[in-house]
Amino acid sequence: MKSLLKLALAASVLALLLAFSATTSVAQEHPAYLHALTDLRHARAHLERPDHGELREQEKKAIHEIDEAINEIKKASIDDGKDLNDHPPVDAKMDWPGRLHRAIELINKAHNDIAREEDNHFAQGLQQKAMEHIDKAHHHVEEAIEVVQSRM
């Protein structure tokens, strides 16, 4: 009975090590995707109202598209294990138009990060879907900027 328990424990440890090394390997092969995840979470944080006020339709759509892009990247087994709230801090003194412009910059960085040539055919499809969501998010943030500028 003890030898069976030892064997099960050894098999569990081996499975854990294999899973960890596979995750590390994917991350090493696609560091740009990890940068894109960070940029997308950071852009998302800039789109959240600092006073927790109501988001306009364009901002809601942009956040939705960012979430979808993050999900597509994670479907490609490129997951850094971080949640949406794990991002660099947002400057609390930045006004709303500044936050929107910063979100555009971060979305552009994420787009550039994942736009690199992909040799994995499976990942190419997910890459394309993620880029479509990123481009839609960019469009919605531009719309939000136009709304803000029209009210100034």
Briefly describe each language-model feature range:
Residues 8-21:
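Bacterial N-terminal signal peptides
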Residues 1-5:
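N-terminal secretory signal peptides that target proteins for export/translocation
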